[in-house]
Amino acid sequence: TLDLKDDEAVKVFVEKVKAEAGRVDVLVNSAYQGLAVTKPQLGKKFYEQPLSTYDDHMSAVRWAYAMSQLVAPGMVEAKSGLIVNISSAGGGLYLFSTPYGVMHSAMDRLAADMATELKGTGVAAVSLWPGGAVTESTAFPDGETPAFAGRAVAALAAAGDLAAKSGKILMTSELATEYGFVDATGAMPVGSMASGAGV
């Protein structure tokens, strides 16, 4: 496993990937401590939570920034590449807690600002909002499996010119309609937490 808190280890990892694969074509920034930092503070106001809760959430933004900074030069040199920040509707409306929302808003802004600085290079940066997940630790009714977001990223990567989408917030359900894919279950997620629901 890679310790994203170790900057040198991250650099070594990226260089190893470049050496083995030649270059990085797609980067998906999805590292987040998740329920481990969110669940213990559910129902508590921001002023009732330890300050460390904010840092635990915001570490995801630093990791995304660091990985993007390391792979972007190769993408720019190749005049091709896609950076995807996995975010959430929590970046646009209140969901779970203040630190959760601030972190996802920052992930969205990171994609938007990177896209501005990448304009004209052939490299796109987007923010992707999956819906409520069905995983080994969560199960929103009629939610999305992780494969659904994976298929959204694959569809984007295969689409070619993404200049019109770069800097935007994209929703897995909307991309499924646009590119014609379904979830691993064979269904189109329709739960109340489906990406974009209520936004």
Protein language model features and the residues they cover:
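Short, flexible, mixed-charge acidic loops at enzyme active sites
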Residues: K39-F46, D183-M188
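Generic structural signal for alpha-helix termini and adjacent loop/cap motifs
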Residues: E20, A78, A159-L162
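Hydrophobic pocket-lining residues within nucleotide cofactor-binding pockets
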Residues: L2-D6, A133, L175
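Catalytic loop of short-chain dehydrogenase/reductase
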Residues: Q33-V37, K45-T53, H57-A60, V76, ...
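A glycine-rich helix->loop->beta "capping" turn
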Residues: K16-N29, L35, A66, A124
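C-terminal helical subdomain
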Residues: R62, G120, S127-L128, F140-V199
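The beta1-alpha1 cofactor-binding region of Rossmann-like NAD(H)/NADP(H)-dependent oxidoreductases
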Residues: T1-F13, L51
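A short, exposed helix-loop element centered on a Lys and neighboring polar residues
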Residues: S68-Q69, A112
